[in-house]
Design a protein with these regions (language model features):
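Long, well-ordered alpha/beta core segments of mature domains
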Residues: 1-741
Length: 741
């Protein structure tokens, strides 16, 4: 093995590739924000003159720059591509990717082959960003520029919402795939289906290879890939066709020559380039000599003007044959069409219509073809479908509708926006909360319910949240409805038992307070029951804790739930409950998936470690599994998990994948069983350091404090009202634990 030196260029993970990547648990810290840790972007956005900003963007569209000339004298196509590629990395299954943070400005995205020359689009927007400063984030500006591009070419958009705060460093939590090199594709199973943890066909592409799957120009196979990939972005067939047909009504691709003429991508470019990459050595390297994908296609006769029939008419009217363009890439040319496509730089030159393999896929796939023909015959329906799909594409990762900012928010509410009913009742007071807790405590003492069950259901309700797209969570009590109620990890029978118990409590409370119009929502009651159970478990361990409670959650209704997008909120892996969904081939290890889940829950390493150890001793494993339950005092909030994990008498051996036996070194007696998630806290030296702190003779209070910090955080991740008022921040800073004896 090579020696590690702090002065060496290799990172720890380059020396030891299997080292857990814990940095993803403390990304983009407030200290990185030059405006300060308490910068209020919503407050700044409210000062913005949106009309003037849009007027400035309209001027950008038609003021062609010599250093990067605009095709057809209009940057609209380029700005649509920038907005699309910024938002289009969104994956519905974990909420990562997308336009948030303005992450397309950073590696790896700015260096992807699919994003060649988008660095120039960002640079063209800099004068506007400079003018408005902190009032508009890059993330919002990029999406707004896409909208203005469409509007300036005659298309009526559906609306715009701000609220995307900028990041100040790359997001390294997203698993983009297993490949080492760009444009490789090692992410399909034996059936040709993409692995569950990725959403694009190739490393470095946002969707599919425009030449065809793995470079094979087969439109039928391309249609399969398109359907699979767009579905992972929560788009149905009609939305998919609307987006492709609408987006490809503008602009062109660029393949004046092979991509071998391109210089290094922005992160690898020389310092004198000042952040710009892909400097081309082919002729002028710009304008008519531009190389981006290496494909040279102009779809319509009106590349800088909206015409709802242009792309669809070109696609469906003519017969296309395969060719290789000047860039050496596969593309399709209309063999029976006249030269009707204008050249972007030579007014005396015309071209035949051309298409990508992925465009022809819409023609050969029978379902897509039918939608195309419907849209061609009903242009107004197509315009509306494209407008709505574009809004969804560019706003899916912004979070629930409650987080939208600005005056252009559409009035119509779509189910995918996760709307919630308004609170139409009086919330419980402090004395009511005390009374409800007493009732729950009494039921636990009488054996009507258990600490384990109440904690498990509260966690199940809250832990669907993803900080990535701010969806999921306890508000709405969606766990009472399908598809949430039937998620395997929620243990439906266990869930039903707890819900019946809590529904009786709610019924009695609402009835007693009918005159005052006071009610307790199931969403609030589920969390309150979990809090109460943890307080009981702490008392059993010898400590008194009081978990602050903030009523204000509301119960949703079935009609508010979009079942198509809701299914993506199912946690198919949750190390906190020692759960991996059966019959899924995961690329990453269980312990890597734990870190992934912890990041989605916005947890720090100390909070994650404490929560795993605490939930184990509270007997909160999926299917009541004994693995990792290192205690003889279950349902007591002790540090037993850490004490027993670090027992020097234990020797662990693998029995089968993800199952280990811990036996006494002295006697050979089987003491415990564990999964990889359990054992990682004794194996990874950073997590072991945390475990040692919690296992120490004076470590139990420290453990409980960090457990409570993690618990309170997870239970309130979707309480955006509390985050705005910074109430939770103050609570987490002032957790008090008192010894009972």
């Amino acid at each position: 093995m090579k020696n590690f030196s702090g002065s060496g260029k290799l990172t720890l993970r380059e020396w030891w590739p299997n080292l857990l990547y814990l940095k993803m648990l403390y990304q983009n810290p407030p200290e990185l924000n030059p405006y300060g840790r308490h910068f209020d972007y919503a407050q700044e956005f409210a000062k913005l003159d949106l009309d003037q900003l849009k007027e400035d963007l309209r001027k950008v569209m038609t003021e062609s720059k010599d250093w990067w000339p605009a095709d057809y004298g209009h940057y609209g196509g380029l700005m649509i591509r920038l907005a699309w590629h910024s938002a289009g990395t969104y994956r519905a299954f974990d909420g990562r990717g997308g336009a948030k943070g303005g992450l397309i400005r950073f590696a790896p995205l700015i260096g992807w082959p699919d994003n060649v020359n988008l660095d120039k689009a960002i640079r063209l927007l800099w004068p506007v960003k400079k003018k408005y400063g902190k009032k508009i984030s890059w993330a919002d500006l990029i999406i707004l520029a896409g909208n203005v591009a469409l509007e300036s070419m005659g298309f009526k958009t559906y609306g715009f919402a701000g609220g995307r705060e900028d990041w100040w460093e790359p997001d390294e939590s997203t698993y983009w795939g297993p490949e080492v090199d760009m444009l490789q594709s090692e992410r399909h199973d034996e059936r040709g289906v993409l692995y569950q943890e990725v959403a694009a066909e190739h490393m470095g592409l946002i969707y599919v290879n425009p030449e065809g799957p793995r470079g094979n120009p087969d439109p039928k196979e391309a249609a399969k890939e398109i359907r699979m990939v767009f579905a992972r972005m929560a788009m149905n067939d009609e939305e998919t066709v609307a987006l492709i047909a609408g987006g490809h009504s503008f602009g062109k691709t660029h393949g004046a020559a092979p991509t071998s003429y391109l210089g290094p991508e922005p992160p690898a470019a020389p310092i004198e380039n000042q952040g710009l990459g892909w400097v081309s050595s082919y002729k002028s390297g710009k304008g008519p000599d531009t190389i981006t994908s290496g494909i040279e296609v102009i779809w319509t006769p009106t590349p800088s003007k909206w015409n709802p029939r242009s792309f669809l008419y070109m696609l469906l009217t003519y017969e296309y044959e395969l060719e290789k363009g000047p860039g050496g890439c596969y593309q399709w040319v209309a063999k029976d069409a006249p030269e009707i496509i204008p050249d972007p730089y030579d007014p005396n030159k015309k071209h035949k219509p051309r298409m990508l393999t992925t465009d022809i896929a819409l023609k050969v796939d029978p379902v897509y073809n039918q939608i195309c023909r419907k849209f061609l015959e009903n242009p107004e329906e197509f315009e509306k479908a494209f407008a709505k799909a574009w809004f969804k594409l560019t706003h899916r990762d912004l979070g629930p509708r409650a987080l939208y900012l600005g005056k252009e928010i559409p009035q119509e509410v779509s189910p995918w926006e996760d709307p919630l009913p308004e609170i139409d009742f009086t919330l419980p007071e402090e004395k009511d909360i005390v009374g409800l807790k007493k009732e729950i405590r009494k039921a636990i003492a009488e054996g009507k319910t258990t600490v384990s069950d109440l904690v498990y259901v509260a966690w199940s309700s809250a832990a669907t949240f993803r900080i990535s797209d701010k969806r999921g969570g306890a508000n709405g009590a969606k766990i009472m409805f399908e598809p949430f109620r039937s998620f395997e990890v929620n243990m439906p029978e266990r869930l039903d038992k707890v819900l019946r118990f809590l529904e009786e409590i709610k019924k009695d409370f609402d009835l007693k307070n009918q005159k005052d119009g006071k009610k307790i929502s199931m969403a609030d009651l589920i969390i309150l029951a979990g809090d109460t159970a943890i307080e009981v478990a702490a008392e059993r361990a010898g400590y008194i804790v009081n978990i602050p409670f903030f009523p204000g959650r509301v119960d949703t209704k079935p009609e508010f739930i979009d079942s198509f997008t809701a299914k993506f909120l199912e946690p198919i892996y949750d190390g906190f409950r020692n759960y991996l969904k059966s019959n899924i081939k995961f690329v990453r290890t269980p312990e890597e998936l734990l870190i992934d889940r912890a990041q989605l829950l916005a947890l720090t390493p100390p909070e994650m470690t404490a929560l795993v150890g605490g939930l184990r001793v509270l007997n909160c494993n999926f299917n009541y599994s004994p693995h990792g339950v290192f205690t003889k005092r279950p349902e007591s909030l002790t540090n037993d998990f850490f004490v027993n994990l670090l027992d020097e008498d234990l020797e662990w051996k693998e029995r089968e994948f993800n199952l280990y036996e811990g036996r006494s070194r002295r006697t050979g007696e089987l003491k415990w069983t564990a999964t990889r998630v359990d054992l990682i806290f004794g194996h990874d030296h950073r997590l072991r350091a945390l475990s040692e702190a919690y296992a120490s003779d004076d470590g139990e209070e420290v453990f409980i404090k960090n457990f409570l910090k993690g618990w309170i955080k997870v239970m309130h991740l979707d309480r955006f009202d509390l985050h705005k008022e910074r109430k939770l921040e103050r609570v987490l800073e002032n957790i008090i634990i008192l010894p009972k004896f």
